[in-house]
Each structure stands twice: as C-alpha cells, then as structure tokens.
Regions:
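Rossmann-like adenosine-cofactor binding region
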Residues: 156-220
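Rossmann-fold NAD(P)-binding glycine/threonine-rich loop
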Residues: 197-244, 248-250
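NAD(P)-binding Rossmann-fold cofactor-contacting core
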Residues: 137-156
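Glycine-rich adenosine-cofactor-binding loop
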Residues: 9, 100-103, 110, 117-136, ...
Length: 254
C-alpha cells in the first residue's frame, strides 16, 4: 500500500510538512508521498471530496481552512470537538473523521514552558482555539478581530479576557504569522512575557524566539511544535509511532 497525504491551505509553499513526513515514512518503512495543495474554500471542499473518494489517505489542514474542515467532518476526536477546529482528516468506512493534532501539541508545549498560570493568546483562528482547548487557566487575547474574539468568549465562557488585563509573567502563545518575515512581536506583548510558544517558523529562529532565549525565558519554537503535531497526525493516519525528534530534525534541515 502506498500512502498519499497532503497539506491544504493558503499559503503552503513555505511548509516543512513534506520533509517531516518523508522522514517519518522512511523511518517507518512505509511507501508514500506528501503533497502541498494551495486552495481556496471551494477548492478545499473539492479536496475533501477526493479524500472521501479514496484519492488521499489523509489531509492536514492549515490556515485559513481549519474551521471549514471542522464543519465538513462526519465525526471527530475529543480534541477536535474541544477546539471546534480540525487540522487532520481521514476516512473510516465512508465517514470523514477530524482530529486536532494542534491540541495534542499545545498540551505538550504548555508543560514544556513550565505549566503557566495564564497565557496571552496572539491570534483568534483555528490554532488559537486549539490552544484554548489545551490550556485550562485564564487566557488573555490579543487579536485584530473583535468578532473572532467574541466568538472565543462564547465558545470558552469565563476563560477569555482582554489583553489589557493580562498579568506580567504570562506565557505568550503566538498563533499568527508574525515573525515569519523577520518582524518582532510588539513591545507591549514582550513586556508581559514569562515564556513563549511561537508557532511561526522560517529560516532559523524567529526574532521572538531569539529575544525570549536571550532573556532566559522558556521557549517552544515553531519547529518543536510542528514536529509534535506532525508526529501525532502521522500516528493517527498510519497507526505507526515516529518520534517528534525525527520530524524536528527533518524540519530544521528543510
């Protein structure tokens, strides 16, 4: 059997997922390919139809389609249900199943940065929902969309608060692309930081990771997060466990 996986979203050209999954397939002794599919919402729906028809073994989903993916699933794991967001899809029988390997990765990342009492969530999309599903303390949101922030408050009642009320020492959780083009997070955020979970990745460290490391703060960077998320997706699709270290090494080597 040859597996066929793909990452769907826009943008996807920068993704390191193909390198990670090729490494996982090789270590597991499995045949397969991992593709990148840039798509708009209508094209994504067509891709899900192809998944259901058996043309793909599994899909990863990235921005901006994680919420749409959630609505297209027949069944979902507890993690996806908690997050109201799906980043991993497969077919069992004739039904589409959704999972959030983001939630799994956030649970580990939160422990790795010292199990903080509060976090400052940067962004309001699907990854942000996964962070909220994984963390059970107060969450202070810094986002551009008041509508999306209000949606988070409705989904997670009593858990979401305005950034202005956030205490110093909160862990920053960056679920936006800020940093991918070499830009630093705003000073108002850094002033509150007691640690950092930084999802963006690019060539080397993002400025936020360099800043946090230089200030002696606990950090989980985008490569580490992506590797745990990818290993979880691979196991959910294939039933084979491949260590995140294999994925992380492949990601850092491009």
């Amino acid at each position: 059997m040859e597996f066929r996986f793909a990452l769907a979203g826009d943008p996807v050209a920068h993704s390191l997922s193909p390198a990670m999954h090729r490494a996982a397939l090789e270590e597991a002794g499995l045949a397969g390919v991992y593709e990148l599919v840039r798509c708009d919402p209508a094209e994504f729906r067509g891709l899900v139809d192809k998944l259901k028809a058996g043309e793909f073994s599994g899909l990863n989903v990235t921005m901006p389609h994680k919420r749409l993916a959630y609505t297209l699933c027949d069944h979902m794991t507890d993690e996806a249900g908690l997050a109201n967001s799906v980043n991993t899809m497969k077919v069992l029988g004739s039904l589409i199943w959704g999972h959030s390997s983001d939630v799994v990765a956030f649970r580990k990342a939160i422990v790795d940065v010292g199990d903080p009492k509060s976090i400052i969530l940067i962004g309001t999309g699907g990854s942000a929902r996964a962070a909220l599903a994984a963390f059970h303390g107060p969450v202070y949101v810094w986002g551009r969309s008041a509508e999306k922030t209000e949606s988070l408050k409705i989904q997670f009642p009593g858990r979401v608060f305005p950034f202005e009320d956030s205490p110093v020492g909160s862990v920053l959780v960056n679920c936006t692309p800020i940093g991918m083009k070499g830009e630093l997070l705003p000073a108002m955020l850094l002033e509150k930081a007691g640690g950092l979970i930084d999802l963006p990745y690019g060539y080397g460290e993002t400025p936020a990771v360099s800043w946090a490391t230089g200030n002696g703060l606990p950090v989980v960077d985008g490569y580490e997060f992506l590797a745990v998320q990818a290993a979880e997706s691979f196991h959910w699709w294939t039933g084979v466990e491949v260590g995140p270290s294999t994925m992380a090494a492949a990601a850092r080597n491009g």
